């Protein structure tokens, strides 16, 4: 079912198991190594959220702030309700809702059965040249629910990445590198894989549901929710820094990030976030009846 795996287990901050097994891809006979670079997709989201919360700690925004304070492009959004009718937004979309995936946005993963997701898929957000163009396209799409009404996994963290850019005055990749990756010595984490490290970059795969075999999706048509016939993302010449899905990392690098969170925002004497902020971030912010 998989070509290769890197297993890394930490207990109380100490490595107790670290092993690579298998090969690097369905079309790559090279042995898997512990320093291989993987696309981490949605594991990018906590990194972007930490970047945003650093700015929150500095007083650069409040969780009650309207998203339109930083992204005015979203001021005229409509909601496509379950009856297929457009209705006005009833309350302001807040930064807190954006970080909780309760802002009413979507992703396009259920395009076969959902009209809003079909519109997301047609908008082809991932082909935008940069985050500014991304949000211009997003602004033309309807919300699937009223802000704050329910949880739905979405592109909200990509919008958060744009807000990090606009508040900090830095590109998202530059901000994350300076304020998170370099302080934590995460030297193998990138939005764009350096040329001298591309030999460690793994192939991307999905499982063919009809045959149960691995398919290299760098070349094959992609599953639902992505553009057909192209790689899921380009990690060699990046201009769209996707805060929700854009990073590449090694297992050890992400372990350092996770250990920083476990220790309350600090690792090896370097503080990334305050312990109260970490405690706030890791509590349950969703009511049970909103988990739809």
Language model segments and positions:
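Short, conserved catalytic-motif segment at the N-terminal edge
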Residues: 1-40, 60-62, 76-82
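Active/ligand-binding-proximal structured segments within catalytic/core domains
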Residues: 48
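Short clusters of small/polar residues that mark proteolytic maturation junctions
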Residues: 20-22, 66, 219
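Short, surface-exposed loop or secondary-structure junction motifs
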Residues: 77-292
């Amino acid at each position: 079912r998989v070509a290769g795996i890197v297993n890394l287990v930490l207990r109380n901050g100490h490595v107790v198991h670290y092993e690579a097994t298998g090969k690097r891809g369905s079309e790559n006979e090279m042995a898997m190594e512990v320093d291989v670079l993987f696309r981490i997709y949605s594991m990018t989201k906590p990194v972007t959220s930490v970047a945003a919360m650093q700015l929150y700690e500095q007083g650069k925004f409040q969780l009650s702030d309207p998203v339109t304070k930083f992204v005015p492009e979203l001021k005229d959004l409509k909601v496509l309700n379950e009856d297929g009718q457009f209705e006005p937004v009833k309350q302001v979309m807040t930064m807190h809702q954006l970080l909780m995936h309760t802002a009413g946005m979507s992703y396009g993963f259920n395009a076969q059965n959902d009209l809003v997701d079909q519109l997301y898929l047609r908008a082809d957000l991932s082909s935008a040249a940069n985050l500014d163009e991304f949000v211009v396209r997003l602004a033309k799409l309807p919300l699937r629910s009223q802000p704050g009404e329910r949880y739905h996994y979405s592109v909200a963290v990509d919008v958060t990445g744009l807000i990090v850019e606009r508040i900090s005055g830095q590109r998202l990749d530059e901000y994350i590198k300076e304020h998170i990756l370099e302080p934590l010595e995460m030297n193998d984490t990138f939005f764009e894989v350096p040329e001298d490290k591309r030999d460690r970059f793994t192939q991307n795969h999905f499982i063919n549901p009809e045959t149960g075999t691995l398919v290299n999706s760098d070349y094959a048509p992609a599953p639902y929710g992505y553009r057909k016939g192209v790689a899921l993302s380009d990690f060699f010449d990046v201009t769209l820094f996707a805060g929700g899905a854009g990073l590449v990392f090694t297992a050890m690098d992400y372990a350092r990030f996770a250990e920083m969170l476990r220790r309350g925002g600090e690792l090896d004497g370097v503080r990334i976030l305050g312990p109260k902020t970490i405690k706030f971030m890791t509590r349950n912010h969703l009511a049970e009846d909103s988990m739809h």
